[in-house]
């Protein structure tokens, strides 16, 4: 199961175009996307970036580029703790950013320091989906070291449950992505973000 390929503003109704206009005018903060692998963070980040002309930082991609190796290779050579430290340092660096969509790796929100850094200049949005949906989205992807030899619903469900409390504690907003296309997910997210931002003023 994949997200609907349609991810541009073309063909949207007037209400959606008005929503996009209002959000462009009001958004002066970062949007930090967290959640389990396959929840839709990268797809949503690309769509939001396109709609609102916001910068996008894919943390895993940037870390991989800077280290000159893939995420599985970083885990293999240096271990998970080394990788988690790279995540923390990058989040600290991103404090200088504004109007940026930050797509975090699946484990980034497991560290309380990371969550603190995320919240300093933005809203944290948790994207979530059922274990079966996650498996369908990641089963052809071998760039997931924590799922190596464990691509099954039972293992994914166990790992998601272990992370659930910290994910939910970190999140300012939770968006379910099952059975929704990317436009529906993004519309729900920005509508709720605008409501939250208006209350925080």
Protein language model annotation of sequence segments:
Residues 13-26, 47, 51, 161-201:
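NTP-dependent small-molecule kinase module
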Residues 33:
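Hydrophobic anchor at the beta1->P-loop junction of P-loop NTPases
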Residues 36:
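P-loop (Walker A) phosphate-binding loop of NTP-binding proteins
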Residues 39:
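ATP-binding Walker
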Residues 42:
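Walker A/P-loop
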Residues 58-108, 112-119, 143-145, 157:
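ATP-dependent small-molecule kinase phosphotransfer cores
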Residues 120-164:
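A glycine- and Lys/Arg-enriched "phosphate-lid" helix/loop adjacent to the NTP-binding pocket
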């Amino acid at each position: 199961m994949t997200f609907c390929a349609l991810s541009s503003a073309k063909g949207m109704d007037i209400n959606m175009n008005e929503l996009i206009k209002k959000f462009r005018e009001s958004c002066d903060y970062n949007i930090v996307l967290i959640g389990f692998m396959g929840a839709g963070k990268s797809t949503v980040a690309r769509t939001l970036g396109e709609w609102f002309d916001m910068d996008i930082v894919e943390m895993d991609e940037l870390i991989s580029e800077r280290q000159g190796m893939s995420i599985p290779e970083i885990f293999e050579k240096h271990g998970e703790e080394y990788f988690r430290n790279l995540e923390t340092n990058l989040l600290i660096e991103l404090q200088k950013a504004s109007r940026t969509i930050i797509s975090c790796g699946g484990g980034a929100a497991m560290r309380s320091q990371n969550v603190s850094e995320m919240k300093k200049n933005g809203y944290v949005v948790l994207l979530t989906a059922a274990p079966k949906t996650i498996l369908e989205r990641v089963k052809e992807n071998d760039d997931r070291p924590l799922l190596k030899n464990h691509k099954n619903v039972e293992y994914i469900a166990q790992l998601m449950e272990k992370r659930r409390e910290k994910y939910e504690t970190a999140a300012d907003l939770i968006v379910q992505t099952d059975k929704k296309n990317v436009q529906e997910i993004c519309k729900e997210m920005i509508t709720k973000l605008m409501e939250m931002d208006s209350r925080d003023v």
